């Protein structure tokens, strides 16, 4: 066991994150205090919660270790979004109990305490998501707070990070105001609560000063940032800043590093972000989960959007910012999805020509309203539709990447080994999108930004050579 993450990948896998997490644990100064093992599962938003807990534990003098057997207590930060994630969480809790015996559970699955207790009655304590203080209380109970000189800092200014040093997730809000019928996030994390803009920008500045070259802005609903405060004025560095996603993006764009927006809900005011991308202030990359194209399915999901309107919106965005890359996610096999609905989705996909796409087969989630919808789709039909959908998108992706051949692109290096370097362009987020391979380039370092001549492409990835000055 190590301090680790589990993130489902939709296209390709990169081991950088786990390696860096192991290195992070080794690089932390030993404190001599009680030792904590930590397992972080699920999405980047959960990863940020783990970073916050670990930062506080280090501040209090606890030591973070890499094995079950060396730990006085093991914390498992769980995911409970879909059935496979629930099973992953329960299996991990069971492994920690078997190997160590003293386990504290937190995270999204922690909101369903009875379900955990039924399978694993021996856990020491259970808390829901972002219940940081409750987690620490459980730790204090079973691994007393070490005697620690408060004037000896065990934590870097930017806190403990579970990502490689050159990129970091920046969470701007918690919770969600939407009630999509396939989702139970609001029941676990509550309604949307935005962080003060000054607090976000201060964290971003600390991360930049620590060497971060890429900020990945995340939340449950990034484009709704500030709606809970009615987009009131906040302050950053003594200057007023409106608490909305456009103003926040403008401020982040002044830092001179890559800024990538994730989980952007398809509101009309997303239009305001595109000029910032066209001007080079933030990356021309939009992660926007459309989920489907059929009006009937979208209505059943309680999702916004009409197929023709979103297509017009995408066309308008690309006219303003031709370099724009759009990533999206979709659900096939949603209850009540007819053959006609699915064909409509495929036609929309062909028309939209999205750059990066993830697809999920609908999976019932305990507590989700969609479970009560009539006409559940068989697993066989779900699989057929999934394969058909991904084949269509694979052809789109391959054609788009072929057009990159012969161009020179800026690439951020993620990993270097004895065979060469692996990086990403602005079009690719870590863990979920494609990669750029530079065979033989063993002298580069993670975090470097280099120019690469693209020479080859497949359905998801690129190969190229370094452009030397």
From Swiss-Prot:
Cofactor binding remark: Binds 2 [4Fe-4S] clusters. One cluster is coordinated with 3 cysteines and an exchangeable S-adenosyl-L-methionine.
Biological process annotations from GO: tRNA modification
Statement: the UniProt record of this protein carries the keyword Lipid metabolism: no
InterPro entries hit by this protein: Elp3/MiaA/NifB-like_rSAM, Methylthiotransferase, Methylthiotransferase_CS, Methylthiotransferase_N, Methylthiotransferase_N_sf, NA-bd_OB-fold, Ribosomal_uS12_MeSTrfase_RimO, rSAM
UniProt enzyme class: transferase
Pfam families given in the database record: Radical_SAM, TRAM_2, UPF0004
CDD domains in the record: Radical_SAM
Cofactor: [4Fe-4S] cluster
Disulfide bond entries: none
EC number(s) stated in the UniProt entry for this protein: 2.8.4.4
Binding locations of [4Fe-4S] cluster 2: 176, 180, 183
Superkingdom of this protein's organism: Bacteria
Gene Ontology terms for molecular function: 4 iron, 4 sulfur cluster binding; aspartic acid methylthiotransferase activity; metal ion binding; protein methylthiotransferase activity
Domain MTTase N-terminal: 34-144
Keyword tags: 4Fe-4S, Cytoplasm, Iron, Iron-sulfur, Metal-binding, S-adenosyl-L-methionine, Transferase
Reaction(s) the record says it catalyses: L-aspartate(89)-[ribosomal protein uS12]-hydrogen + (sulfur carrier)-SH + AH2 + 2 S-adenosyl-L-methionine = 3-methylsulfanyl-L-aspartate(89)-[ribosomal protein uS12]-hydrogen + (sulfur carrier)-H + 5'-deoxyadenosine + L-methionine + A + S-adenosyl-L-homocysteine + 2 H(+)
Domain Radical SAM core: 162-399
Sequence positions that bind [4Fe-4S] cluster 1: 43, 79, 108
One CC-aspect GO term: cytosol
Subcellular location: Cytoplasm
Record function comment: Catalyzes the methylthiolation of an aspartic acid residue of ribosomal protein uS12.
NCBIfam families (UniProt xref): 30S ribosomal protein S12 methylthiotransferase RimO, MiaB/RimO family radical SAM methylthiotransferase
Similarity comment: Belongs to the methylthiotransferase family. RimO subfamily.
Name of the protein in its database record: Ribosomal protein uS12 methylthiotransferase RimO
